[in-house]
Amino acid sequence: FYDALLGTLDVPPGRVDRHRIFYRTKTGVFSVSKPIDGKPATPANGGTIGFAAASPEQADAWHAAGIANGATSCEDPPGVREGPAGKLYLAYLRDPDGNKLCAMHRIA
């Protein structure tokens, strides 16, 4: 799922390390892991994981790849939203495990 989703943002495929997978870019690291406490994994309540998109088109491709690989759309459809942070193009998904994700492009 995440290889297909993050590939639309030009992120290389993840590297598996024991019970984790890492996605590395020049600006950060995203990792998915089995819980180290042995308890079941659960989606964040009120949390959103965000990824930068280079353009609205890239955010749309990210959203489409997510849907094609088992995600569900949430929030409003992808599009422009204005608020205190300025004008943003946002696309929201829930991954197959229910985690809320967002691709964001800041419009100049």
Model region roles, listed by residue range:
Residues 1-30:
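Core segments of cupin and vicinal oxygen chelate
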Residues 23-27, 93-96, 106:
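Active-site beta-strand termini and strand-to-loop segments that position acidic
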Residues 31-35:
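Conserved, structured core segments of small domains
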Residues 38-42:
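Short, charge-rich, low-complexity interaction segments located
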Residues 44-48:
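Short, solvent-exposed beta-strand edge segments and adjacent coil->beta transition regions
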Residues 50-97:
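Vicinal oxygen chelate
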Residues 82-83, 106-108:
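A short acidic/small-residue loop/turn micro-motif
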